[in-house]
Amino acid sequence: MAVSRTLRELAEYLGGTVAGDESKTISGVASLDDAADHQITFLANPRYAPKVATTGAGAVVLPPGGERHGRNAIHVANPYLAFAKLLTLFHVAPRKPQGVMEGALVGHNVAMGSDVTIYPGAFVGDGVTLGDRVTIFPGVVIYEGVTLGSDVTLHSNVVVYQGCRIGNRVTIHAGTIIGSDGFGYAPDGDGFYKIPQLGIVVIEDDVEVGANTTIDRAALAATRIGRGTKIDNLVMIAHNCVIGENCTIVSQVGISGSTKLGRRVTLAGQVGVAGHLEIGDNSMVGAKSGIPGNIPAGSMVSGIPAFNHRDWLRASAVVPKLPELRKTIAELEKRVRELEEKQGA
């Protein structure tokens, strides 16, 4: 059944104030370009402000003092957050629990909470614990002794290795591997001796992990992902790493073993982090950067190797001019030699 709300109701839901017709009914969310009269849109980036005047939306979510150009509007402190909440209200329908469906394989001594759904083709090993409202999609493999909290969703082809622990309200997207062996080998003459990886992975509450990401199990204790952290697709987190709370790790990041991230650290796309390092709280690392050493709390760094972001911007501005500068330096060197030859004559 479609959801519809008046602007007055939406303003109460979002903690905002209405400008215009409070009784206007809204039944969906769309972009500034595509919205129709029954839909609400939002403005979070000032560069798109001119589109407020031309949008076909029935209402616009704006920041405080934002120009509404005669449109119905809801003013809120954080339009982007409001947009997310509106999408949840209008377009995210809760799934009805299906129980253990035919074709699912469930082992012995599995403890299940209420309203669990296990789709056909999923495998749940012996001694697994599933909290309330867990959803396990086709192709998921859960090894023995795993613990999942409540409101956990594992999308198709996720694999969770033995003994790993996943908290409440965690979503893991398709193809991700939790708890595979860490990359540990001891040199043995001309070859290598595999170091058994006996630890686990612990994923705390409110974490989301994207598709095709790998988080390796620790050698002895736990690789840990802190509460509220968001991890994108195609990320590699090696054994023994500890990721702090509310971190953001963007696609194609690689974090080597035993590295620790503090709280609220952001690693942009394709960052590479060496092993046995510490990155302090509230630090930000620019895309494609290489981290060879520790990063103090509150830092903003970029580059290979990474250094202060502002200095990196200045250095990057010089790079396109290097051929011209090289030519200029060569000419200056030639003139200096000529002057020296004249003085010595």
From Swiss-Prot:
<dbReference type="GO" id="GO:0016020">
    <property type="term" value="C:membrane"/>
</dbReference>
<keyword id="KW-0444">Lipid biosynthesis</keyword>
<comment type="similarity">
    <text>Belongs to the transferase hexapeptide repeat family. LpxD subfamily.</text>
</comment>
<dbReference type="GO" id="GO:0009245">
    <property type="term" value="P:lipid A biosynthetic process"/>
</dbReference>
<keyword id="KW-0808">Transferase</keyword>
<protein>
    <recommendedName>
        <fullName>UDP-3-O-acylglucosamine N-acyltransferase</fullName>
        <ecNumber>2.3.1.191</ecNumber>
    </recommendedName>
</protein>
<comment type="subunit">
    <text>Homotrimer.</text>
</comment>
<dbReference type="GO" id="GO:0016410">
    <property type="term" value="F:N-acyltransferase activity"/>
</dbReference>
<dbReference type="Pfam" id="PF04613">
    <property type="entry name" value="LpxD"/>
</dbReference>
<keyword id="KW-0677">Repeat</keyword>
<comment type="pathway">
    <text>Bacterial outer membrane biogenesis; LPS lipid A biosynthesis.</text>
</comment>
<dbReference type="InterPro" id="IPR001451">
    <property type="entry name" value="Hexapep"/>
</dbReference>
<dbReference type="Pfam" id="PF00132">
    <property type="entry name" value="Hexapep"/>
</dbReference>
<dbReference type="InterPro" id="IPR011004">
    <property type="entry name" value="Trimer_LpxA-like_sf"/>
</dbReference>
<keyword id="KW-0441">Lipid A biosynthesis</keyword>
<dbReference type="Pfam" id="PF14602">
    <property type="entry name" value="Hexapep_2"/>
</dbReference>
<dbReference type="InterPro" id="IPR007691">
    <property type="entry name" value="LpxD"/>
</dbReference>
<keyword id="KW-0443">Lipid metabolism</keyword>
<keyword id="KW-0012">Acyltransferase</keyword>
<dbReference type="InterPro" id="IPR020573">
    <property type="entry name" value="UDP_GlcNAc_AcTrfase_non-rep"/>
</dbReference>
<dbReference type="InterPro" id="IPR018357">
    <property type="entry name" value="Hexapep_transf_CS"/>
</dbReference>
<comment type="function">
    <text>Catalyzes the N-acylation of UDP-3-O-acylglucosamine using 3-hydroxyacyl-ACP as the acyl donor. Is involved in the biosynthesis of lipid A, a phosphorylated glycolipid that anchors the lipopolysaccharide to the outer membrane of the cell.</text>
</comment>
<feature type="active site" description="Proton acceptor">
    <location>
        <position position="239"/>
    </location>
</feature>
